[in-house]
Amino acid sequence: MYIENSALHQSDRSKKTAQHCFTSFPLQTHKATTFASRLSQRLLNCSHTNKIMNAQESVKIRFLSHRLLKQLQLSSESVTASIEHLLRSRRTAQVWNAPKAVITPPDGRYMMATLAAADNPQILAVKSLMLNPANTARGLKSIYALVTLLDSDTGIPLAVLDGGWVTAIRTAGLSAVAAKRLANADAAIAAFIGCGVQAQSHLNNFADLFPLKEIRAFGRGAENRDALCRSAENLGLAAIASKTAQEAVQNADLVITSVSLSPALKPFLDARWLKPGAFVTMTDLAAPWFAESMPVFDRIIIDDREQEAQMQKPLVRPDLVSGDLTALVNEEITGRSTATERTAFIFRGLALGDLAIAALAFQHACADGQGTLVDL
């Protein structure tokens, strides 16, 4: 059952029985539909969308900080259900997703904006994000972002959210949606290449989704690596700080790569290291992977074919792509077919994912009366 309250959903991993098969996870379409209906109704109850405002009434925007958003503790199930609902709604013309707009100055900065809108829930979301590797030397985070929500019918501004939190939850949520269909259900060992924010959010999601027993962590920074290992141990998992990327990846059931992008990054990961049956999610545009090793995968899914067609440089050779996430969720293409297939999800980030998570957080914050209201 999908959980909509603000309490953190904690899976009882001791009750999970590992299946020595490649059975896909239940798609639970009717539950996702019910979830979406309740989400939409609660949004109507807590936003401006349930009333016609007169000319004298002031518009108030709800500001949701990173600290507050973390306190909402959205469940993994509610995150994936929200994303799956919007992916299905694309086929009924209730959701619109624009390809991301990107600016990449020659000094290594990465500037990006995404736009998505839906009729159910009645929300439009715009995210602006800036990444600068030089921020580290300034004592700043490398990424800053904001998400703005508007009513998709009236255009009334609704909220501004910390985009870093939305991006972390959305990215892990997209990976989880793909993993449900592309990974073996009995996956027990997860390898993390890159140990920052994305690794932490993926650990939390995948620990709920799979009967994990062990993680392996490899990254440049010992502080982040050790923090990830501690998080795994707090979940009751064995944690190994791997000395090399190959050591981490070999014999892992799940591989999560979230290597920071920079002009200096050179490929250092080889898909030929993967064991039969492994699933890889690449949140880093597949940049750290040797392109010549990609044909090892039996099935590669990307986030969005329409978006990919407009990108200057493809994530992977187009002839290696089996389809995108919307087609996968709508069962227009198959996921894993055998227990020994090597599968991968490679993605840039999908605007409707930002919409799904921001709308979900907005719903919970409104229902709980949280956030700072600011006059427009």
Where are these regions (language model features)?
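NAD(P)-binding Rossmann-fold cofactor-contacting core
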Residues: 210-231
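Aromatic (phenylalanine/tyrosine) cluster motif
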Residues: 2, 22-25, 35
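Glycine-rich adenosine-cofactor-binding loop
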Residues: 175, 186-207, 219-224
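N-terminal ligand-binding/catalytic initiation module
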Residues: 39, 46-167, 176, 183-186, ...
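Rossmann-like adenosine-cofactor binding region
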Residues: 237-315
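Adenosine-phosphate binding glycine-rich loop
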Residues: 287-376
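Intrinsic-disorder-associated, low-complexity terminal segments enriched in Asp/Asn/His/Tyr and depleted
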Residues: 2-5, 9-12, 20, 30, ...
